[in-house]
Amino acid sequence: MTQGSRLYFAVAVLMCGFVSINGVGLNDLLERASQLSDKLHSLSTSLTNDLDSHFPPVGRVMMPRPSMCHTSSLQIPNDKDQALKVPEDELLSLARSLLLAWSDPLALLSSEASSLAHPERNTIDSKTKELQDNINSLGAGLEHVFNKMDSTSDNLSSLPFDINSLGQDKTSRLVNFHFLLSCFRRDSHKIDSFLKVLRCRAAKKRPEMC
């Protein structure tokens, strides 16, 4: 079994785990969510490596700054120590807000991947569709976590994404695809970190053990 196949199988198992959710405790829900968010970050890293294997030098010059990511306006903890000070319901809202913010961008990436000017476009196309499917599964799982936590706050931030094209020429499209993916990879790491803090708190571990 290849690395990609193992990753796909692991994520598929986790997705199935969210289907039969009745009677599952909060600790187990957060464990499943943390595992899935970890797989998503691994998949986005693998995709980035695929793109980097044949990325034009001019693309590095054309790449927008990270501050141009559409989620950069969201005020979030910068590290684990800060995240440990954020209330549980607020931390969950941040993770859910980031997931929702990637619904449209991932749909755009999924629609563009198969026509990229890149020799690995078939692999990139397949992995991008996996990302889109799996982030939807994680979003559904976090809805169950929200309900299980009996939170009174459902304050989700709106992070609009108004782009419907990656560009007209092949280089621009490849650069913008890479840029969006780099933004997602950054955000998937944040989501993974937030969920691991929530999992640690649910297990009543000491902060220094998280």
Swiss-Prot record:
This is Prolactin. Pfam families: Hormone_1. Disulfide bonds join 69-183, 200-210. Belongs to the somatotropin/prolactin family. Keywords: Disulfide bond, Hormone, Secreted, Signal. InterPro entries: 4_helix_cytokine-like_core, Somatotropin/Prolactin, Somatotropin_CS. It comes from Carassius auratus. Its main location: secreted. Residues 1-23 form the signal peptide. Pituitary gland. GO terms for molecular function: hormone activity. GO terms for cellular component: extracellular space. It comes from the Eukaryota. GO terms for biological process: positive regulation of cell population proliferation; positive regulation of receptor signaling pathway via JAK-STAT; response to nutrient levels. PROSITE patterns: SOMATOTROPIN_1, SOMATOTROPIN_2. It is found in: Secreted.
